[in-house]
Amino acid sequence: MATPTQEQLKTLEQSRQRLVQLTRSLASLITSLNQSDPLPSWSSLQSQASIISNNLLSVSDHLSDNRDLLTSLVAYPGPDYPGRTQANTLEQLLRTKLDPRVEDWVARGRKAGASALEDKSGLAEAELAELWDWAPVEANQEARRRNWGGNFTLEEREMGVQNVVTGLARVLEDEGSESEDEEEGEEDEMEIVGVRRQSAGAGFEFDIAPASAAQHQQQKFVEPAVPLEDILRFMTTGAEPGKR
């Protein structure tokens, strides 16, 4: 192969920089796990994991974009390379096989990818679209048949809570009577009692029980305690609201 051009050398330098960033972010995570007592907060770990994920994505995209160049390059030592003092580095540069552990990871990844491509039992795009149309409505209807937040499910209450084996030393109270009293005082509250897909066009239709006039008068608009932007940032990076 001819001497690399300046553009090719620039690509190699970019590869080196991305790999250095990935190595440093991994080393930072390992150091924080090994030396911190107690362990770092989950928000800190989430932030570090996000950085590592971004670095991995950057390396993957760069290697894919420059696949032809990187697969055609051949490394060899020049006459001026200090082979005696830098033997370990030279061995790594001239290595033609992956590390045994890495080779096993690559083999498993390729096997999993090939299995996914050969799987003919998967759903077609039309079937997936139909599934996603069906799932939200069915999940909503199933959720409304459950007793969320209680000690017993509706099925367990119907067959008798005294027959339920919980495996707990303490006895769980049946909150059914209390919830019935609460429901009597909340009959006039607005409640979504059903959901279904619209007959024409996209979207859903909800069946809503009307609220009383007194309830309408008492309703007041309340500003959210945490802005939506901070909530999304907290979900993706782990950063606490109000902190950047």
From Swiss-Prot:
Q: What is this protein called?
A: Mediator of RNA polymerase II transcription subunit 8
Which GO CC terms are listed, alphabetically? Answer: core mediator complex; mediator complex
Protein source organism: Aspergillus oryzae (strain ATCC 42149 / RIB 40) (Yellow koji mold)
Alphabetical keyword list: Activator, Coiled coil, Nucleus, Transcription, Transcription regulation
Family that this chain belongs to = Belongs to the Mediator complex subunit 8 family.
Principal location listed in the UniProt entry: nucleus
Q: What would be the name of the gene that encodes this protein?
A: med8
Extract the coiled-coil ranges from the record.
6-30
GO terms in the biological process aspect are: regulation of transcription by RNA polymerase II
